[in-house]
Amino acid sequence: MTTKRVNTATNKIMTLNTFLDTCFLLFISILFYLSIPIYPNKVVVVPQGSLKKVFFSLKDQGVDINALDLLLLRLMGMPKKGYIDMGDGALRKGDFLVRLIKAKVAYKSVTLIPGETRYFFTQILSETYQLETSDLNQAYESIAPRLNSAVIEDGVIWPDTYHLPLGEDAFKIMQTLIGQSMKKHEALSKQWLGYYHKEEWFEKIILASIVQKEAANIEEMPLIASVIFNRLKKGMPLQMDGALNYQEFSHAKVTKERIKTDNTPYNTYKFKGLPKNPVGSVSLEAIRAVVFPKKTNFLYFVKMPDKKHAFSATYKEHLKNINLSNNHF
């Protein structure tokens, strides 16, 4: 009887040892498996949907993933949706699975330079974030501020470098860009004017956008602004080429034919006053030039051979400067 009890106890111990050995071997095997290097793309796309859908999507992207990984993910948790940054080079399989669940969403940077138009910036956004320009334009028009019930076509998005997550839709991208930009507009207006009034502020942005397009450098900006104010005060048409560099014409040379045929409010040769919308994005310096313009009696300016402008108070002086300019070009 005693021998039988001893044998039973021995069998239980042996069974337990076998079980523990098996668990240990399984543990070591999993550790070894999780340490195997894989070479995923720098950015992988995790779709919305079931874990099975995620699994097959990763396989389609060339990720070395199998049924065991699917089982491990079921135990670890649901991967994040979106574009996941996996970094550069090799990753251990375990690190890859953890990044699927906990890693930061991948970002890309995009820059709007002062003077550029929304037309071209939208194309850059489209190429960078793989979005349709039509969707981006529709999103902009639904979010952007309005003047007299009409969307402000340009000059709203602040020129800057933006770091935006991949995988966001057009509405979210525009919501971020316009939201951040409007905070800057309001803050700057309150800093320089002591208050923010949308209509008054964006009239200054319209002025600044022409200054931005016309000035050869930052130093000229207050002088260009003074010419604009002086001509407006006298009821003179602005007659500025830069106002015609709107939207898709941002980089187009303004010709006599263009001045003759363009019938939009941007044509300050045909229409007195300011255009209804900013011509493009504006820098801090251009806005400052409009808020704090230089006091001059200048009414004219012309580009000289050194690419800078010669300013004059009378048409007679202006003609002399034009002759000097023509003789050197």
Q: Where do the language-model regions lie?
A:
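N-terminal Lys/Arg-rich, disordered targeting/topogenic segments
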Residues: 1-14
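Hydrophobic, aromatic-rich alpha-helical transmembrane segments
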Residues: 14-18, 318
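Hydrophobic membrane-insertion alpha-helices, especially the h-region
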Residues: 17-34
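Signal peptide-directed extracytoplasmic domains
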Residues: 27, 36-187
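Bacterial extracytoplasmic/cell-wall-associated proteins, especially those involved in peptidoglycan
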Residues: 127-131, 144-329
